[in-house]
Amino acid sequence: MISEKIYKKVLGIGGALIVGLLFSIFITLLINSLPTIKKLGFKFLYGKTWDPVFGNFGALPFIIGTILTSVIALVISIPFSLSVSLFVGEYYRDTLMSKILETFIEILAVIPSVIFGLWGLFYLAPIVRTLQLKLSLPPTGVSIFTASLILSIMIIPYAISVSKEVIKLVPIDLKEAAFSFGATHYEVIKKIILPYAKSGVFAGILLSFGRAIGETMAVTMVIGNSNYIPKN
């Protein structure tokens, strides 16, 4: 009984430390932001001009660029991450092929972002430049689209890691019952697996979106290094 009380207190202290850490981060950001807030107000958030020489600091282009690249990357990554999750977690579950694929996914997740940035700059950007030429667009190669492609590759492993585990947790009895009524594998996935695992799949998507929002290095290397709001 005493050990159980101690265990609960230790868990409570651990939880309180996490909350306290988040609170301290927020307070630190707020305190260090006060000089900017006093000088610029909230104009910093909606200003469009970034010119340190004349003291103009508008973060709106960076905010919009972050949101655009993250949303586009998420749209690109969802079909691939969901397909691979079903492949690993359902079709080829616990097979050698799925284990090999899971290993590659884990390796992809730990590759430094600067490596993705260099690959995007020297390999993907020329491909995008060729595509822009064919579409009669300015052939820069570095753009929102290029950054979104890099981001989508970077966040796919995070969505897969969560989604495949949730898909594996779908009770076999539910699937066997559906098969016994003559349902096809596609129907089982559509009617049983995805509805059951939707919360976990959404959590994986949310995790990957957070990863995309927080990425800086790779995006900076391929987005074009321009502080203006894109018009196309």
Task: List PLM regions with ranges.
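N-terminal signal-anchor/first transmembrane alpha helix
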Residues: M1-I27
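Membrane-cytosol interface at the C-terminal ends of specific transmembrane alpha-helices
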Residues: V84-F87, P138-S180, T184-E187, I192, ...
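Membrane-interfacial helix termini and adjacent extracytoplasmic/periplasmic loops
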Residues: K38-F57, F116-I153, I223-S226
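A structural signal for multi-pass alpha-helical bundles of membrane permease subunits
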Residues: I25-L34, L118-V128, G210
